[in-house]
C-alpha cells in the first residue's frame, strides 16, 4: 500500500529542524523509558507524550523526560496543533508497540506528519493479517518460520493459537493445543470466559508449536554505516507461565490451571559462540529482504524472536519491526560491548544513530 505521507514530505520537514535542538519523542508506554534513557546518555533532548492517568513513571524518573505533554488520549497526538507543537521542538518520534497500537497504522501512514525514526511502512508488517507480512519477509529472506495452518481442522500436531485478547488489545492470548479436538475444547472455554472473542479467534493465526529454547535476537540496521549489528538477546517473563511451571508436576496437575503467556518482564541471555555465525546470517538476510520489499528497508532496531531446536536450527516465530521493548539489554548484553566497549541498549543505539546523522547532515536517511 502506498503511503499518503511521502518521504519527500518528511524530508522537507526534517530539513527545517534546528540541529542544535533535535528532540527524541515517544509516547509514554511500552519502552519509552529505555528510549529516553538512551537519548539522555547521548545528551539529546526528550519529549514524552503521556495519556492522562498514565504519566506517573515518567514524572518519577526525572532525568529522562525534558518535557511531558499530557493528552486526554494518546491518539490526540494526531491533532494538527499537537503535531505542529512537536515539529516546533524539532521532534523525531521513535516507534514502539504502543505507538502502533494506540495511533493505528492508517493514521501513522497517512496523517502523522512527524519524522519517525525508522520505516513507518514496516510497522504494519508485524500484523499477520497483512498481505506482505512478517512471514512473507521471512520466506523472502530464506529464514524458517513455523508451519502455518490455514484452518483449525488441519491441526495435526501441537500448535500455537495466536489471537488478540478480548479486553486488552495490546496483549495476545496465545494458547497451545495438541489436536483439532483440543482446539475446539479450549476455544469454547476461552470464549465463555471472555478471554477472546469468536471474531478474533476466526482471524487468529495457527502455527506449528516448535519445541526448543527461546531467544529474542535483537539487531540494529544502520543506514549511516550500512551495517546490521547484533546488539543482544533477552527472554520474556510471562504470567502465569512463570513461575507456575517451577512447581512440582504433581501440584501443577492438581491445580489444573489454564496457562497463559502474558508478557510482564524480561531476563537476559547469551548464546553459545558457535551459533553466532547463524545469528549474523539471519540478521543480514532479513535486512536485505526488507530493503528489497519495503524500500528504504529497516532503519534501526528489529527483533527476530526465535526458537533454537535440538538440531541447533533457528525458527523465527515472531518479528518486531520497531523498538522491541527490552530494557534489560542496556546493562546485560555482552554483544553491544564487543562493538562499543560498553554495554548499551536499543535506546542509546538509536540516539547514537541520530547524532551521527546530524553530524553528517543525513537526517533524511534515518526518518520516514
Give residue spans per PLM region.
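Short N-terminal binding/cap micro-motifs at the start of the first secondary-structure element
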Residues: 32-37, 56-57, 169
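Active-site nucleotide/adenylate-binding loops and adjacent lid/helix of ATP-dependent enzymes
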Residues: 50, 76, 124-215, 220-232, ...
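A short beta-strand motif that forms the metal-chelation/ATP-contact edge
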Residues: 158-162, 218-219, 306, 312-325
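A short glycine-rich, hydrophobically flanked beta-strand micro-motif that places a catalytic Asp/Glu
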Residues: 207, 218, 294-311
